[in-house]
Amino acid sequence: TKQVEKNEDGDQKIEQDGIKPEDKAHKAATKIQASFRGHITRKKLKGEKKGDAPASETDAADKKEEGPAGGAAENKESEAPAATEAAAADSAQQEEGSKDSSAPAEEKKGDGAADTGSEQPAPQAATPAASSEEKTAAAAAPERESTPKASTDNSPSLKADEAQDKEEPKQADVPAADTTATTTPAAEDATAKATAQPQMETVESSQTEEKTDAVEETKPTESAQQEEMKEEESKADQENA
């Protein structure tokens, strides 16, 4: 029922206007055709002689008097290629727009690749510096462990000398490894740190030497005390006997 009402509304509008849309289109087509033909006939009139002008005018009048159906068909044919041309132009514009959009995208990709390329060397340069620092830390750890061992052991100064001999080649190897492995400013910082660490290690080694000397000095005092205790015990045993 609703569809029927819509159709009735359309019919009422047509009745009010008194002219159907098809009639409007047909009239517009006939006007366009008439103007187009009149333009062609004017060109012909200009090119032809004055005597032939009445004949051309009569031909134009005859063409205008042709059936309206033929005029409408010609109008549709003329409009169809125009529509196709407009569609082709739109598609060409869209293709150009897509090309333009793709070009910036490619440029952005290129820029992104350049950015990543510039960023990659920095981590690569940082890794050798980090590795050198790790090496120095690893070398310092066993050295620090060796120094407490030398202090805790109540051994003579020979072990302390051996520990020093072991530490010296390690200290010599660490800066050499740093200088060969790194060439960046970060590497220079790492080498500075590495040179500072051996200095600290030398200070620690000197402290261990002092500790060993102190231990050796305390040994004779302890032995003297033990001997005195033994002598007192022997004296007491003799008195008891």
Curated annotation (Swiss-Prot):
- InterPro entries given in the database record: IQ_motif_EF-hand-BS (IPR000048), Neuromodulin (IPR001422), Neuromodulin_C (IPR017454), Neuromodulin_gap-junction_N (IPR018947), Neuromodulin_P_site (IPR033137)
Which SMART domains is this protein grouped with?
Answer: IQ
Q: Where is the composition biased (Basic and acidic residues)?
A: 1-26, 132-147, 159-171, 208-220, 232-241
What is one term from the GO cellular component aspect held by the record?
postsynaptic density
Q: According to the UniProt entry, which residue ranges have a biased composition of type Low complexity?
A: 80-95, 118-131, 172-198
Q: Does the keyword 4Fe-4S apply?
A: no
| Family to which the UniProt record says this protein belongs | Belongs to the neuromodulin family.
Protein name from the UniProt record: Neuromodulin
Q: Per the UniProt entry, what species is this protein from, by scientific name?
A: Serinus canaria
Q: Which gene encodes it?
A: GAP43
